[in-house]
């Protein structure tokens, strides 16, 4: 149920009204000699409204707005100085156009490949002064001869 109240104050008068249901839908408005506001809203949070302001020097503004899932949008109508539509100022272009420069990506070198490991030569387990000493099993005596008087044993 909307209710309407009005009161007279020594500086002017105002009027207001408000309604609201149990699920969150509402409407309200108020007004004085120099400004007014009205808004309706629903339980989903959508709002639509307007307000006006008039200054003593004659400047006036009216804003109509909508707030919903698409965001807040407003339309402003005013006679305030500097807001009238006019021809845009002409601007002289004094420098040539330079296209944007693409960012330079740092060069990344491929990792250096390590050389393949070399196979180790068979290690020498012992030296002997006896000729023929240290021949591997299954080889004839003296097969390990390195030089006259020296022989070595190979470990595979």
UniProtKB/Swiss-Prot annotation:
Q: Name one Pfam family in it.
A: Chitin_bind_4
Instruction: Supply the PROSITE patterns for this chain.
Output: CHIT_BIND_RR_1, CHIT_BIND_RR_2
Q: Does the keyword Transmembrane apply?
A: no
GO CC, sorted alphabetically, is:
chitin-based extracellular matrix
InterPro entries found in the cross-reference section: CHIT_BIND_RR_consensus, Cuticle_Struct_Prot, Insect_cuticle
List the keywords (alphabetical): Cuticle
Q: Does the keyword Mitochondrion apply?
A: no
Chain ranges passing through the membrane: none
Q: Which residues form the Chitin-binding type R&R domain?
A: 23-84
Q: Which domain of life is it from?
A: Eukaryota
A GO MF label: structural constituent of chitin-based larval cuticle
- Reported function: Component of the rigid cuticle of the spider.
Protein name in the entry: Adult-specific rigid cuticular protein 15.5
Highest lineage ranks of the organism? Eukaryota, Metazoa, Ecdysozoa, Arthropoda, Chelicerata
